[in-house]
Amino acid sequence: MPSKPVLSDTDKENIRKRLKELCEECWITQGYKKTSIKSLCEKAGISVGTFYTLYSTKEDLFFETIETIQRRLEEKIFAINRDRRTKDGFAESMKELFKEYDSKPFLYNVNTPDFQSFITKLPEETIKKVKFDSFDFFRQAVHAASLELKMEESKAYGILSALLSTINAKETLSVTCDYFVVFEFMVDSLVADIFK
C-alpha cells in the first residue's frame, strides 16, 4: 500500500491560508450553513481527509477565519488613525469600518439564524473570543488617532455605535439615496462634535 504524502509545515500553513480565504468568500456569498467542508476542499484542491488533519471541525475553520478578519480590520482602522491623527482621519477610519460591515454582515449582525447556527456550536470559551469588544476597539482607535474627546467617553462611543448601526437600515435607505453618502455626511458632522 503506497504511503500518503506528508504535508510540510509550509504546505499546512499555505493550505490553512487558502481555506480561510475561501471560507471568508463563501461566508459572504452563501453563509455559514450553506458552506460545506466538501465544497471548500474542492475549491482548495485538497481532500476532505487533508482538511481534517488541519481542522477538527468546520466551526474551527470559521472561528479562525473570523479572528483573521477581525484582526485585519483592527489593523486597518488603527493604521488609518496612526497615519492621519486628525478628526478627518478618524472619520475616514469609521467610513472604512462601515464599508467592511457592509461587505461582511456577519461582523455586526450576529443575531441572524445563520450566525446563531455557527455560534451555538462553539464552546463557551471560544464564544467569548468571537465577541468583539467594540468599546475597547473604540478606545484604541481614539488612542491611535491621538485625539481628545469633547465629551464623556461612553457618550462618544454610544454616538458612534448608533451611527454604525445605520447599516441595518441600508435596504430602506438605498431605495431613496446612497446610504454610503448619508453615512459619510453623518460621520463627518459627528466627529467634528465629538473631538476637540
Regions found by a protein language model. Give the residues of each.
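Hydrophobic/aromatic-rich alpha-helical bundle segments in the mid-to-C-terminal region
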Residues: 145-189
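Short amphipathic alpha-helical elements of helix-turn-helix/winged-helix folds
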Residues: 22-26, 96, 166
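Basic, helix-initiating cap at the start of DNA-binding domains
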Residues: 1-30, 38-39, 43
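Short, hydrophobic secondary-structure boundary micro-motifs
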Residues: 106-111
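Hydrophobic alpha-helical connector segments
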Residues: 64, 78-105, 160
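Helix-turn-helix
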Residues: 26-60
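Amphipathic alpha-helical packing segments from all-alpha helical-bundle domains
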Residues: 120-161
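Generic hydrophobic, amphipathic alpha-helix propensity
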Residues: 12-23, 40, 65-77, 138
